[in-house]
C-alpha cells in the first residue's frame, strides 16, 4: 500500500530582486569558464558559487583572474542550502547539491527554462558532489545524509550505480553515518563523515574496499591525487592527513591548524601543494615538493569568519565568508622561514615522519611490495610537519585584495496575532512590516528601534488561527500553505482594508482560499477557456465516438475481440519532470537524449468514491457567497445530547457517477496520444477543421472506454465484456495468465458506477470532460467548473514577480521537494505542466470551489450578572452555552439584551466584562478566550448596564499583556 504524498503551496515575497550577491553565507566555490549563449567558445573565466540562500552565481574574474568581479549569471536553483558544487568537464554546466535532497545541473549560458534540470534525488540532505578528474564520461557522484553514494549520468539524469553503507560499515570506529566529504576518480570513491574514518569504494566491483582509520573527529574534506595513489583528508580534529592507498596507511599528519579544518584545495597532480582553511578563518598553503627546504607551511591570511570553501589559481585565493561575501586574497608568502619554527622554539630542525597514526589493513588489496610507512619511496616523497602552536599572536593579513559583496538577507521574523502581518529584520538591521495577504511591504521602521518593542506596539488582541507558516530560511520571506490548515482562518470583512467599505458587517472571508485564488488566477482563467472550447465541440466528439464503437462491435462479431485502443490514452497522463525540460546533453549536442518519463502508478485495486481525496475528513462542501467556510453557525446554542439514531446531514457537491476503467498500457504512449494531450489543443489558435479532427480522435478514445452514450444506455454490458474477456483468456497460452488477469480486472473496473481515486488536477479535468460527453445530446451543457466567486474573494493587485512553488512531501523522504516553481508573470505558459503536477485538493478548490469540510472550533461560556448590578439571571447559572469561536461578542450582547428586556424594561444597553476587562462588540469568542480568559475552563461573561457616556467606560483592553 503506497503512502499518500502531501503537497504544499509556497509564495515568496522579495523586495530586492535586483540585488547582486548571495543573501546568506556562501558555502562553496569552483573555478571554470563562462561560455557565450551559443556555447561555442568561452567568453571569460568564471568563479561559480553556491550559498545558503539556494542561489547559484557565476562571477566574471577575467583571463588574468584579477578582474573586479561582476555577476555573469545567477539562478534560484534550490529551495534550501546549496552544500556543494562541481563543474562539468567542458565547463558548460555547474552541478549542485542541496539540503532539499536534489542534485541539479545548471547551464549558465542558457537563458531559457531549460537551463536548470534535476539530475537525481536522495532521501535526505545531499552534502557533497564530486566529478572524476580527466574522466570523459558524464558521471558525477553525490553523497548525503541518507548514507548513500549515488553515481549519476548528468547528461540524461539517470542513476548509474549506488553504494550504501551497511549498519556495521565501520567496525573499529562505530555505526554508519551520513556522507560529509566525498572525492572520486575513475576507479575509486572515498567518503568520510561522523564515523571518523575514510571509506573506500571500488567502482568496478561496486563494493567497499577498506576503511582508513586515523582521524578522531568528523572528516570534513577529501582530495584524491591524479594517479589515485594518495588521499588528502581534513578533519574537525584540526589535522590534515596524507594517506597511501596502496599501503592503506597514514603517511603524514599535518597539524598546522589549531581549529577544525573545513576545506582543502589542490591543483597539484600528487597533492604536494595544497591549501587549507579552518573554522577560525585561517588559510594556509603547504608545499612539500622540496625535501631539503624547511619552508613548507605558509600562513596566507586570516579572515573573521569560518572558511567553508576555498579555491586558488595562479597568485590568487578565493574564500567564502559571512553575509554572502566572497573574498579574494593574494597568494604571497608572509614568512621566510618555517611557520612552525616561528611559532615554537621546540620545533625540530628537520622534518620527521609521524609515527602515531593508527591504520587498518585490508587483505583484499594489500600488496607486500607496495611502500609502507617506513618505505624508502615514502621517505623520498613526503615529509611531516610538527607544531602545535596557533597563529593568534602573528600579524596575518586580514584585509582581502578584493571583496565580492553579498546581498541583504532576512534573519529574523515574527507573525503578528492578526495572522496577516509579519515583521522582519535583515542582516543590516532594517525592519519591515509585510502584509502577506496583499503580498507587499506595509511599513518600515528605524534601525535603532528594538524588534520586540515594535512587535508589542503592532500586535493586537485578535486571536486568529494559524492558516499559513512563514520562514526566511533563504534570506527572503516565504509563506507556505498546506492542505490541512489553509482553511483554518477567517476574518470579518469590516476588519480588512482590502475589501469594500460597504461589505456586510457579518460577512467573513477565508484567508487561505482568498490568496490561493489570486495566486492561481491565470490557471483558473485558462482552464475556464479550455472548458468552454471543449463544450463547444461536444457534437463532433459524440458523433465520432459512435462511429468508433460501431466499428468495434463489427470487429467483435467477427471474433476479433480487442480491448478499446482508447483505454490507454484516456488514463495515462505523461508527467514531465518538474522544474525542468528534457535535459540537453553537454558533451554531445548532436545526440538527442530524451528525459526519462515519469513512472506511471497503477490504479488502486479497490478504487474509492468518485472525486475523493484522502483526508481526515473527506467530506467536501461547496462555498456559497453567504456560507461560512468553517461550516458552523454564528449563533450559539445550548449543547444537547446527540440522537445516535439520527444520521448527520452531509452534503456532497459535484459527485456524479463516473465510469472507471482500468489502465492498459500499450507498448508506446506519448503525450500527444493521450486524451488530454489532444483536448488541450482546443484552447490554442488552430483552424476549425483541425479542432474537429482533434476532438474526433478524443471522442473515440473516451467514448470507447466508457461504453456509455448521451442516452445513458450501455452499449455492451459489463457482464458481456467480462464473458468475452474470459473466453479470450481461456484460449490464451498459460504464459499469458498475468495479462488475462489484467483484462479481467479491466472489465470489472469498466463497470458503470465504479469510481477511481483522483490524484492530480488533470485527472479531475478528465472526469469533468467525461461527464460532458455523457450529457444528453439536446441538453445545454453548462460548465461544471465553479471557481471561487469574485464577489466573495475579490481580486488582489499582486506583483507579477511573486514566485509560486508547489512542493511535495513523502514519509520516506527527509524533507519536501519542489515540483513546480514559477512567477505569476510566467504561469500562463505552464498550464499543461500545472495540470499534471497540481495536487487534487488544490485543483478541486480552484476549479470547483470545493474543499474538505471542517468542524469549526467552539467556545463554551456562561452568562452571569455583574456583582452589584442588580440584574437578573438570563439563563440558569449552571447552564453552559456554546458557540463558534468566530462569533462576535455583539451577537451575545444582542441575545442577552433580548432576554433581559423581557424582565427589565429600564435596560437600554448592556456592557460585557471578562475578568474585569471590558469586551468590545467586535471581539470574537476566540479572542476573548485566548487573550483575556487564558484558561481551558468555560469563559465567564458578566453583563452590566452600559454607562451613558463613553468617558465612564473603563476599558482595560489596551493594557493586556499580549
Curated annotation (Swiss-Prot):
Residues with Phosphoserine modification: 717
Assembly mode: Interacts with ubp9 and bun62.
Biased segments, Low complexity type: 568-578, 724-738
Function comment: Required for the ubp9 recruitment to septa and cell tips but also for its enzymatic activity at these specific locations.
Residue segments, region Disordered: 568-615, 702-758
PROSITE patterns: WD_REPEATS_1 (PS00678), WD_REPEATS_2 (PS50082), WD_REPEATS_REGION (PS50294)
Pfam families in the record: DUF3337, WD40
Name of the protein in question: UBP9-binding protein bun107
GN (gene name): bun107
InterPro entries: WD40/YVTN_repeat-like_dom_sf, WD40_repeat_dom_sf, WD40_rpt, WDR48, WDR48/Bun107
First-listed, main subcellular location of the protein, grouped into a coarse class: cytoplasm
GO cellular component: cell cortex of cell tip; cell division site; cell tip; cytosol
Biological source species: Schizosaccharomyces pombe (strain 972 / ATCC 24843)
Gene Ontology biological process: double-strand break repair via homologous recombination
Swiss-Prot/TrEMBL keywords: Cytoplasm, Phosphoprotein, Repeat, WD repeat
GO terms for MF: ubiquitin binding
Biased composition (Polar residues): 707-723
WD repeat boundaries on the chain: 25-69, 77-116, 121-162, 172-211, 214-253, 302-339
Localisation: Cytoplasm; Cell tip
Amino acid at each position: 500500500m503506497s503512502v499518500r504524498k502531501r503537497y504544499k503551496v509556497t509564495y515568496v515575497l522579495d523586495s530586492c530582486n535586483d540585488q547582486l550577491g548571495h543573501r546568506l553565507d556562501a558555502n562553496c566555490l569552483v573555478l571554470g569558464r563562462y561560455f557565450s549563449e551559443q556555447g561555442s567558445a568561452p567568453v571569460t573565466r568564471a568563479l561559480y558559487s553556491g550559498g545558503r540562500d539556494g542561489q547559484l552565481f557565476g562571477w566574471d574574474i577575467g583571463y588574468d583572474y584579477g578582474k573586479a568581479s561582476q555577476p555573469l549569471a545567477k539562478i534560484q536553483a534550490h529551495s534550501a542550502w546549496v552544500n556543494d558544487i562541481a563543474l562539468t568537464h567542458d565547463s558548460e554546466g555547474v552541478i549542485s547539491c542541496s539540503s532539499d535532497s536534489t542534485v541539479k545541473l545548471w547551464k549558465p549560458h542558457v537563458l531559457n527554462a531549460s537551463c536548470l534540470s534535476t539530475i537525481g534525488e536522495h532521501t535526505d540532505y545531499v552534502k557533497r558532489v564530486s566529478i572524476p578528474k580527466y574522466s570523459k564520461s558524464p558521471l558525477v557522484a553525490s553523497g548525503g545524509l541518507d548514507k548513500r553514494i549515488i553515481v549519476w549520468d548528468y547528461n540524461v539524469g539517470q542513476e548509474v550505480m549506488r553504494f550504501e553503507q551497511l549498519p556495521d560499515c565501520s567496525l573499529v570506529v562505530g555505526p554508519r553515518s551520513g556522507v560529509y566529504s566525498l572525492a572520486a576518480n575513475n576507479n575509486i570513491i572515498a567518503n568520510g563523515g561522523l564515523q571518523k574514518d575514510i571509506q573506500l569504494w571500488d567502482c568496478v566491483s561496486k563494493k567497499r574496499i577498506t576503511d582508513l582509520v586515523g582521524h578522531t573527529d568528523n572528516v570534513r574534506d577529501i582530495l584524491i591525487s591524479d594517479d589515485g595513489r594518495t588521499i588528502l583528508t581534513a578533519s574537525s580534529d584540526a589535522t590534515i592527513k596524507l594517506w597511501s592507498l596502496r599501503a592503506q596507511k597514514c603517511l603524514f599528519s599535518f597539524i598546522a591548524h589549531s581549529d577544525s579544518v573545513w576545506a582543502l584545495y589542490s591543483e597539484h597532480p600528487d597533492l604536494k601543494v595544497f591549501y587549507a582553511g579552518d573554522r577560525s578563518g585561517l588559510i594556509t598553503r603547504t608545499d612539500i615538493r622540496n625535501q631539503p627546504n624547511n619552508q613548507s607551511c605558509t600562513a596566507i591570511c586570516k579572515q573573521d569568519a569560518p572558511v567553508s570553501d576555498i579555491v586558488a589559481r595562479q597568485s590568487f585565493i578565493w574564500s567564502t565568508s559571512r553575509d554572502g561575501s566572497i573574498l579574494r586574497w593574494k597568494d604571497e608568502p608572509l614568512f621566510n622561514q618555517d611557520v612552525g619554527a616561528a611559532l615554537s622554539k621546540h620545533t625540530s630542525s628537520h622534518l620527521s615522519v609521524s609515527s602515531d597514526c593508527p591504520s587498518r589493513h585490508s587483505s583484499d588489496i594489500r600488496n607486500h611490495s607496495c611502500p609502507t610507512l617506513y618505505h624508502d619511496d615514502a621517505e623520498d616523497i613526503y615529509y611531516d610537519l610538527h607544531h602545535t602552536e596557533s597563529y593568534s599572536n602573528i600579524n596575518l593579513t586580514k584585509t582581502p585584495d578584493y571583496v565580492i559583496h553579498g546581498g541583504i538577507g532576512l534573519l529574523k521574523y515574527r507573525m503578528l496575532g492578526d495572522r496577516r502581518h509579519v515583521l522582519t529584520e535583515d542582516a543590516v538591521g532594517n525592519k519591515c512590516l509585510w502584509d502577506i495577504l496583499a503580498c507587499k511591504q506595509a511599513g518600515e521602521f528605524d534601525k535603532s528601534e528594538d524588534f520586540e518593542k515594535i512587535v508589542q506596539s503592532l500586535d493586537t488582541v485578535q486571536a486568529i488561527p494559524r492558516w499559513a507558516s512563514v520562514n526566511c530560511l533563504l534570506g527572503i520571506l516565504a509563506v507556505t500553505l498546506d492542505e490541512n490548515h489553509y482553511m483554518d482562518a477567517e476574518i470579518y470583512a469590516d476588519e480588512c482594508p482590502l475589501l469594500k467599505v460597504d461589505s456586510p458587517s457579518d460577512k467573513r472571508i477565508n484567508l487561505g482560499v482568498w490568496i490561493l485564488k489570486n495566486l492561481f488566477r491565470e490557471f483558473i482563467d485558462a482552464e475556464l477557456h479550455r472548458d468552454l472550447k471543449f463544450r463547444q465541440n461536444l457534437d463532433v466528439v459524440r458523433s465520432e465516438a459512435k462511429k468508433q464503437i460501431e466499428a468495434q462491435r463489427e470487429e467483435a462479431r467477427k471474433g476479433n475481440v480487442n480491448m478499446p485502443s482508447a483505454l490507454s490514452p484516456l488514463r495515462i497522463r505523461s508527467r514531465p519532470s518538474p522544474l525542468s525540460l528534457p535535459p540537453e546533453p553537454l558533451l554531445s549536442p548532436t545526440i538527442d537524449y530524451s528525459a526519462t518519463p515519469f513512472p506511471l502508478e497503477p490504479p488502486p485495486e479497490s478504487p474509492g468514491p468518485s472525486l475523493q481525496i484522502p483526508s481526515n475528513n473527506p467530506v467536501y462542501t461547496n462555498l456559497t457567497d453567504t456560507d461560512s467556510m468553517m461550516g458552523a453557525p454564528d449563533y450559539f446554542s445550548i449543547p444537547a445530547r446527540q440522537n445516535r439514531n439520527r444520521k448527520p446531514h452531509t452534503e456532497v457537491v459535484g459527485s456524479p457517477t463516473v465510469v472507471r476503467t482500468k489502465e492498459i498500457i500499450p507498448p508506446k504512449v506519448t503525450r500527444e496520444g493521450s486524451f488530454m494531450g489532444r483536448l488541450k489543443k482546443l484552447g490554442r489558435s488552430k483552424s476549425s477543421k483541425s479542432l474537429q479532427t482533434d476532438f474526433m480522435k478524443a471522442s473515440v478514445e473516451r467514448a470507447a472506454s466508457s461504453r456509455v452514450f448521451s442516452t445513458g444506455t450501455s452499449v455492451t454490458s459489463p457482464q458481456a465484456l467480462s464473458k468475452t474477456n474470459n473466453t479470450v483468456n481461456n484460449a490464451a497460452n498459460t504464459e499469458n495468465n498475468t495479462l488475462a488477469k489484467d483484462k479481467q480486472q479491466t472489465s470489472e473496473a469498466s463497470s458503470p458506477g465504479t469510481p477511481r481515486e483522483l490524484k492530480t488536477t488533470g485527472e479531475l479535468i478528465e472526469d469533468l470532460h467525461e461527464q460532458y460527453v455523457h450529457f444528453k445530446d439536446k441538453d445545454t451543457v453548462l460548465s461544471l467548473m465553479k471557481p471561487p466567486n469574485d464577489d466573495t474573494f475579490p481580486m488582489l493587485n499582486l506583483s507579477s514577480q511573486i514566485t509560486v512553488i508547489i512542493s511535495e512531501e513523502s514519509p520516506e523522504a527527509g524533507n519536501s521537494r519542489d515540483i513546480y516553481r514559477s512567477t505569476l508573470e510566467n504561469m500562463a505558459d505552464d498550464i499543461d505542466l500545472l495540470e499534471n503536477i497540481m495536487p487534487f485538493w488544490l485543483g478541486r478548490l480552484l476549479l470547483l470551489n470545493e474543499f474538505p469540510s471542517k468542524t469549526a472550533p467552539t467556545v463554551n461560556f456562561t452568562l452571569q450578572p455583574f456583582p452589584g448590578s442588580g440584574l437578573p439571571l438570563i439563563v440558569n447559572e449552571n447552564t453552559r452555552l456554546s458557540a463558534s469561536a468566530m462569533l462576535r461578542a455583539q451577537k451575545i450582547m444582542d441575545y442577552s439584551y433580548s432576554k433581559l428586556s423581557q424582565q427589565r424594561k429600564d435596560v437600554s444597553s448592556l456592557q460585557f466584562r471578562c475578568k474585569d476587562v471590558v469586551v468590545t462588540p467586535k471581539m470574537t469568542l476566540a479572542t476573548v478566550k485566548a487573550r483575556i480568559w487564558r484558561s481551558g475552563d468555560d469563559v465567564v461573561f458578566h453583563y452590566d448596564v452600559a454607562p451613558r457616556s463613553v468617558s465612564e467606560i473603563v476599558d482595560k483592553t489596551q493594557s493586556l499583556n499580549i
